[in-house]
Amino acid sequence: MDAPVLYAELHLANTQGLRCTSPPSPRQDACWGSGWHRVALKLGCVGLILLLMGLSVLVGFLVQKPPIEKCSVAVQENKTEPTVRSTILECPRDWHLHWNKCLFISQTSRPWAEGLADCSLRGATLLLIGDGKELKLLQDFSKGKGQQFFIGLKYVQEDKVWKWMNGSILNTNLLRITGKNEENSCALISHTEVFSDSCSSDNHWICQKTLKRV
Amino acid sequence: MSAVKIEEASVDKLKIHLTATACLQEEDKGKVLQGKLLRSISPESRVKLHCCYGVVIVVLTVAVVALSVALSVRNKIPVMENCEPCSATCPSGWIGFGSKCFYFSEDVGNWTFSQSSCMALDSHLALFDSLEELIFLKRYKGPSDHWIGLHRASTKHPWIWADDTEYSNLVLIRGGGQCGFLSDNGISSGRDYTHRKWICNKSSSICKSKLGNVPRHV
């Protein structure tokens, strides 16, 4: 009775091992997956690392102080107008040809007497206006510049008349003075009219000289 | 003989039974493993992983691009050393200096017209409180002369500002007129009906609260 039982147990053990080992192996192969997933994963990791490095570098730059520039107030420079030249008649440098006259426009403003002296130093006189066309031209010029200009016209208290620097009396049909007729009054040409201003006031001025044949 | 046969049959039955049980157990283990493997390989979890990676990469890329743009913009607009912090609060077309905003006109007019034009802009013809301010205005005005807020009733009256405060005689006013203007020479005066450009000024409301802390522009 005992011997048959022992034999039966041994047989069972062998049978178990043989039958159960083979089935799982093909399934294990499936677990690995395909190769391209691994490569993709590696590339993804590398990309992430690069992005993180870039991020840290940029943050570092941002935290740094930016370049410093000094304050500068933009001052608009005055452009000099080109000189008009002809083969026969020629004006000196920095002067403008207007018909038969060379005109110089001052770059600064000063009292009338200083303008007169400056013109004299340049071998010229303060502007004398001969006719309505010339007046209109100069008013347009004043408008373009946004400035007013002393000319060679002053009030003479003794005679109670306006006189040009060449001694002639103002013809009121040519131009009319707006403002006070009193002592220390000098003519100031603007874009619309000719004013009487204080001779002591600062203003730009216009010099003229007669054109010479070259 | 029949007893022996019966014994053999029972032993066989026992063998078969035990074997079946063991095999079943093995099969169960296999199924469990199979399930685990399937779960790790399952398309759902794989897709989730890929999505996570994608999202992180996109976020980082966007961050890098944004920072690059911010840096380039910042370099284009450098910070000014010693710039008045209040300048930025002036209206468009106005120039800031200290706690004030200044407007330089393009048009010309007489003194009264100029003052009215400034009042229309909720300001008045310009006042200056210091030599530094005067120097700034002279530098900025360019070649043209500009009316400022100084005036007097006649050549025998004292100078007053457009806001009716008395002038402190900080700078000598030349010329023989009743209205002050800024020229290359400093402050001159002309008759009120003559035409010039003008300067308006108003104070910046934000700057007022910072008056004590605003550094002077040198």
Swiss-Prot record, chain A:
GO terms for biological process: NK T cell activation; regulation of natural killer cell mediated cytotoxicity. GO terms for molecular function: carbohydrate binding; signaling receptor activity; transmembrane signaling receptor activity. Residues 1-42 are cytoplasmic. Disulfide bonds join C119-C207, C186-C199. Keywords: Disulfide bond, Lectin, Membrane, Signal-anchor, Transmembrane, Transmembrane helix. GO terms for cellular component: cell surface; plasma membrane. It is found in: Membrane. The chain crosses the membrane at residues 43-63. It comes from the Eukaryota. It is a single-pass type II membrane protein. Residues 64-214 are extracellular. Residues 98-208 form the C-type lectin domain. Its main location: membrane. This is Killer cell lectin-like receptor subfamily B member 1. It comes from Rattus norvegicus.
